[in-house]
Amino acid sequence: MEQYNITGMSCAACSARVEKAVSKVPGVTSCSVSLLTNSMGVEGTASSHDIITAVQQAGYGASLKGSNKEQVSMSEAEEALEDHETPALKRRLIASTGFLIVLMYFSMGHMMWGWPLPAWFNDNHVAMGLVQLLLAGIIMVINQKFFISGFKSLWHRSPNMDTLVALGSMASFVWSVYALFAMTRAQVDGDSAAVMNYMMEFYFESAAMILTLITVGKMLEARSKGKTTDALKSLMKLAPKTAVILRNGQETTVPIEQVKKGDVFVVRPGENIPVDGVIIEGTSAINESALTGESIPVDKAAGDLVSAATVNQSGFIKCEATRVGEDTTLSQIIKMVSDAAATKAPIAKIADRVSGIFVPAVITIAVITTIIWLLTGHEFGYALARGISVLVISCPCALGLATPVAIMVGNGMGAKNGILFKTAVSLEEAGKVQIVALDKTGTITSGQPEVTDLLPADGISETELLTMAFALEKKSEHPLAKAILEHAENLHLTAPEVSDFHALPGNGLSAVLNNETLIGGSMKFISNRVSVPAALSRKAEELAEQGKTPLLFARNGKLVGIIAVADVIKEDSPQAIKELQNMGIRVVMLTGDNERTARAIGAQAGVDDVIAGVLPDGKESVIRSLKEQGKVAMVGDGINDAPALTRADIGIAIGAGTDIAIDAADVVLMKSRLSDVPAAIRLSRATLKNIHENLFWAFFYNTIGIPLAAGVWIPIFGWTLNPMFGAAAMSLSSFCVVTNALRLNLFKIHDAGKDKKIKQATSIEVKNDYNIKEKEQKTMVKVTVNVEGMMCGHCEAHVNEAVKKAFGAEDVVSSHENNTTVFTAPEKVDEDKIRATIKEAGYEVTGITQE
């Protein structure tokens, strides 16, 4: 998407006009204009020259963002968002108010309340009129922008809010000038009655008051709109301006734009990390709250990644730059927030269509109103006042701002809490989700095996069991071994050196320690070599039913104990799932694990449905099936989740994830917390509710205000509306809409107390993708391989990947509990190749059947 700066827009009708003009350019596939940020996003093959020309022909200015430099600095981008409008409006308002007070003194103070005037004004009605003409003229010159913009838009046949203001004010002024000249004629003729009558036809104060009140509203609106971009501006302010890099062994401070990939930079305690990088020397605690919203510092050491704008709280670190400029995490976040602001939510299209015809319709109504009152026998001044009231009370901005201000504030709220909506569409649609599909590994669980249980045999301590396992597993490369090593190291245990280490077929290890033979492995492996007490055997079975992998250890033929390892559920996962269910959302867990393990983990997490045996390539088809039953959000963090994230109605990438997952997602959660999923949906619902409130107010205001201004209720109730009060109402309408949107800043996205409890959907029925294919492919050869050595889901995934790569099979299903790998092939497969493939993956084949 190419971004453009747009100048000259003043209301929703302007943005609608620009969008319509650019959409007609050949090669443009989509265009969205943001009145809040005065920007435009365009997709397609059209040249920037054609696009800019189209904008200019519509009566506005345009320039391609970053066209003058290869890279726009963060300070320049920040400057572009600065509120330059409010100070200018404030100066205009102060000057206008000063002259308006004097004008009101002359026009109403003397006549209504008898306030004193200089003697030369006594009975000098022409002088009174000339003073009012002069003062009103000065105020019109001060607020000339309304007239320039309004009549320019009218000339281009795209009238906007400024056109309504300019027409209303100018009509009052022109009629008053006519009345002044007519009064001078009457005074020359000595017709004092006519003179007094024409004095009552002066609307100079209305012409000036309309402009002043609209300026008040514009200033309040600009101030409020400025606050809607606070989140984006605060993100930009986080970007460091300089970096300290090492060149020839010397520290040199350079502008951030000069840092290149591969440069080595240093960061002292209290300083911000300038760019994304990897620590090559030193340790520290890094405060990443700027990016993730998480206030607790994260310990970092050599080899760990650091991100721009995070704060080094302790320790001197030396880092190598890996991402600079627009590639840093901070820059990508800012780009996502900016792009979201430049897109339009589907609900905004209603307001856009209305805004496009609103101003011409209002002008037509004003003309008809004036004519009708003239035809009913009223004086021209009275009829004109009704028409002017219609012009100045009508507010297209209230309609046009209803959606974008809420989207901008909601998006900013999300960004402050580490929740990034990539488009306005994703912010609107996330709240409509009915089914949430969660990838198990890395989403519900931590993604890394951990030690969960230590069960020593009689007479053996936990420390003794863990030390022995530590010594035995230290030389193993298995993922489960790493879990035991990490647990032991966290307890500051020391592993004695073993000799004669062997990885044995059938899920086992052996070694010698102090002339004692140590063995470890699966239940099946150990039970074939030593006697396992019935109590421990039952306990191992219970652990397996809970989705854990029991590892047994023996010394000199006697069982020492059991260590259970599992990919544990994240601390906040059950609560997050419960919150989703309370919101009326059905939660489904997708996993490649076998049915038994999947059911155990699903029960612990509290999900509604479990779909087991789902291959990486099968997630997309499962999502397609779920979409037939409701609007689906897919939550994942890996490369193999990308197709499913794309297929879902809303794709949510959780945690740091991968670049591919982030690219495929609609919503990016910076933290690895599942609780941010209900928070994102909650924020979406609150934003959508706010939009509905804004649209209701905007339509209600115009529906009630225009008939009142036109005088519809005069024959019934005698209600009339002075043009000045109409202008005041117009000023406040947009302000009310923007202020209502700003209430979202007070919304607590993690507060589940006010969640609307919707009746849950009916049970979800999704057939296992493998079973579907098995039925469809009865003519295929089913290959069942007996495999020794698989101990967990990680082993299964390893074997699946090896078989898939070697034979092109798409439906490989492995089970470490059954020690089998099953897949289908169009014809019988070379069994020697199967054995070689499995052996190369680190496992042994004990049998093959093909049928």
Predicted regions mapped to residue ranges:
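Conserved ATP-binding TGD loop and adjacent catalytic N/P-domain core of P-type ATPases
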Residues: 16, 29, 433, 513-515, ...
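Conserved cytosolic catalytic loops of P-type ATPases
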Residues: 26-43, 48-49, 201-202, 233-327, ...
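Transmembrane helix-loop-helix hairpins at the membrane interface
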Residues: 88-242, 353, 454, 718-723, ...
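ATP-driven catalytic headpiece of P-type ATPases
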Residues: 91, 310, 431-438, 444-477, ...
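Membrane-embedded alpha-helical bundles of multi-pass transporters
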Residues: 112-126, 155, 174, 413, ...
